[in-house]
């Protein structure tokens, strides 16, 4: 019967062969389910080998819920060092915040295996109310090997706060009087928030070299893209120490940002003037390939003639223009056709022949419509002119008067408008600029860069 079987299995827990003991632990759990937990815990308390501990831990994980994990508490006081370590690991596996107070004292245990298990477990057990305890421990711990685990625990506790705007509050208060800023500041990358970002930027600007390094690493690992503006400023400053990693951090944060493709394109354009190497340009082109917009395609197309960027540009253009797995339609138009025709010639890599064939096939099936025209070429004011009156007044003017006034308006354009760094610049005074052609179906993507006393708009 079952009782005789269980008796045999229980006896097997004491077998000399560790493999038999491991099988016995698994068998007891399989046969008795949660009812096996007390016997397995008793075995855990007396087992001296790591193999036995791993076997009983596995068996307990297969049958334990919150009620069963609570039975482990006596092991923390009565069990051997190796049993306490296993109990702590099981509590961490359960992720019950109620065990934080049980485990916390063992983070200072003189027994290294127990101490290491406890420190690592805190990240799974900590809640918002436990932050000050973790800050005290993180600030005072002597063994630097534990710093990263305690930082993870503090981040876990803070981010458990349901209100994202206050997740950094406890840490920020502690930083006002802490002598361990270098340990607390990196956690702010996970907790985020404007006040936290402002503090890190201030410490970066005013701190000593070591603090500047810590703050910079915090900025590049910031959890959302709100630090991208700071990283851009570091890139623009041409700081030789931080500039390269700031560039890469900016690209990473924009790539993962929860913003539209159009907004990402504007940010990539913003950093593009500082992509002075082919590697940087190709990194931006790789990211452009993720943006299914016409402006992204047109921008990628401008890099097709440079041998150092043509391959990355071609790959990006192909991915942008051709239909995706989610859509049966791709992009079309004269500019698209021109870019894809050149793309087919620039593709490289092991799948280049296949990709080339795919592009050629798509070109053959593309609608013959003219498609979108670019209103601004990024180089000069071709297609733009000075504005004469408003449309209603202009429609009532004699042709000869309109032509004369248009010539006068055009003469004023160079004094008021110019192109620099791929942008149309207005000096803040003078007349309006308008397109030469009239457009009835258009998409306008505008990146406002208005400086102090700026005066410009669209109507």
Predicted regions and their residues:
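Carbohydrate-interacting regions of secretory-pathway proteins
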Residues: 329, 354-459
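Solenoidal tandem-repeat scaffolds enriched in leucines and small polar residues
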Residues: 19, 36, 51-55, 82
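Alpha-helical, heptad-rich or low-complexity scaffold/stalk segments
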Residues: 244-252, 283-286, 305-323, 330-333, ...
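Short inter-helical turns and helix N-cap capping residues of alpha-solenoid HEAT/ARM repeat scaffolds
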Residues: 16-17, 48-49, 79-80, 110-111, ...
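Core register positions within helices of long alpha-helical scaffolds
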Residues: 27-30, 58-62, 90-93, 121-124, ...
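Amphipathic alpha-helical scaffolding segments comprising HEAT/armadillo-like alpha-solenoid repeats
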Residues: 2-14, 33-45, 65-77, 96-108, ...
């Amino acid at each position: 019967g079952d009782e005789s079987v269980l008796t045999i299995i229980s006896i097997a827990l004491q077998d000399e062969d560790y493999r038999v003991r491991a099988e016995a632990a698994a068998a007891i759990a399989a046969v008795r389910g949660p009812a096996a937990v007390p016997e397995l815990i008793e075995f855990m308390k007396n087992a001296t080998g790591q193999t036995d501990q791993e076997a009983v831990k596995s068996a307990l994980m297969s049958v334990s819920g919150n009620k069963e994990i609570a039975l482990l508490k006596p092991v923390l006081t009565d069990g051997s060092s190796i049993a306490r370590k296993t109990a702590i690991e099981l509590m961490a596996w359960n992720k019950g915040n109620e065990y934080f107070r049980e485990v916390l004292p063992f983070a200072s245990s003189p027994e290294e295996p127990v101490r290491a298990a406890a420190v690592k477990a805190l990240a799974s057990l900590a809640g918002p109310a436990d932050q000050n305890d973790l800050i005290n421990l993180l600030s005072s711990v002597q063994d630097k090997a534990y710093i990263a685990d305690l930082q993870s625990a503090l981040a876990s506790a803070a981010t458990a706060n349901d209100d994202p705007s206050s997740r950094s509050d406890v840490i920020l208060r502690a930083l006002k009087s802490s002598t361990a800023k270098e340990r607390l500041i990196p956690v702010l990358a996970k907790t985020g928030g404007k006040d936290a970002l402002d503090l890190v930027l201030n410490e970066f600007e005013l701190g000593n070299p070591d603090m500047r390094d810590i703050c910079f690493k915090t900025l590049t690992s910031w959890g959302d893209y709100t630090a991208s503006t700071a990283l851009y400023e570091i890139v623009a400053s041409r700081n030789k120490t931080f500039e390269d990693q700031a560039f890469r951090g900016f690209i990473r944060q924009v790539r993962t940002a929860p913003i539209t493709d159009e907004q990402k394109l504007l940010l990539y354009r913003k950093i593009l003037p500082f992509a002075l190497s082919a590697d940087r340009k190709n990194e931006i082109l790789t990211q452009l390939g993720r943006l299914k917009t016409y402006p992204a395609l047109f921008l990628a197309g401008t890099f097709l003639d440079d041998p150092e960027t043509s391959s990355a540009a071609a790959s990006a253009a192909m991915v942008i223009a051709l239909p995706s797995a989610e859509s049966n339609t791709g992009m079309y138009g004269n500019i698209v056709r021109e870019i894809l025709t050149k793309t087919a010639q620039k593709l490289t890599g092991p799948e280049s022949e296949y990709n080339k064939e795919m592009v050629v096939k798509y070109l053959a099936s593309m609608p013959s419509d003219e498609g979108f025209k670019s209103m601004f070429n990024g180089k000069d004011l071709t297609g733009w002119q000075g504005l004469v009156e408003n449309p209603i007044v202009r429609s009532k003017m004699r042709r000869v008067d309109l032509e004369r006034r248009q010539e006068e308006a055009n003469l004023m354009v160079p004094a008021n408008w110019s192109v620099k760094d791929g942008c149309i610049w207005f000096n803040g005074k003078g007349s309006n600029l308008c397109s030469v052609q009239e457009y009835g179906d258009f998409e306008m993507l505008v990146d406002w860069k208005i400086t102090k006393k700026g005066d410009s708009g669209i109507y």
